[in-house]
Amino acid sequence: INGEALAMADALGIDEDTFYNVVTTSSGNNMILKGKMNKVKEKDYQPGFALDLVVKDLELARDCCNNLQMPNFTLNTGLQMYRLAQRKGCGALDSSSVIQVIRDLNKKDE
């Protein structure tokens, strides 16, 4: 969600600092955004928590939901996004590297 919100801010011409200041002082505030925003701004995707590990954890959570016969709509959507980032070569990078894939998907043909 953070990545999609930041990509939308980019598309609207809102700079990253303004986005960060608004979101972190509102109901959108969250620890992941606070912890990863500097890495995103610097495009520093050295792994703190590798994207491959996010995929593994999401797959385990999905399997648990399936075994319990519980719906997992948002989990599956997130898993698809992280798998796409894996296929784009981001697996060994920090999980925040998913923002680059989202940004690339949102680029308009010039």
Give, region by region, the residue ranges found by the protein language model.
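ATP-dependent carboxylate/acyl-activation modules
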Residues: 109-110
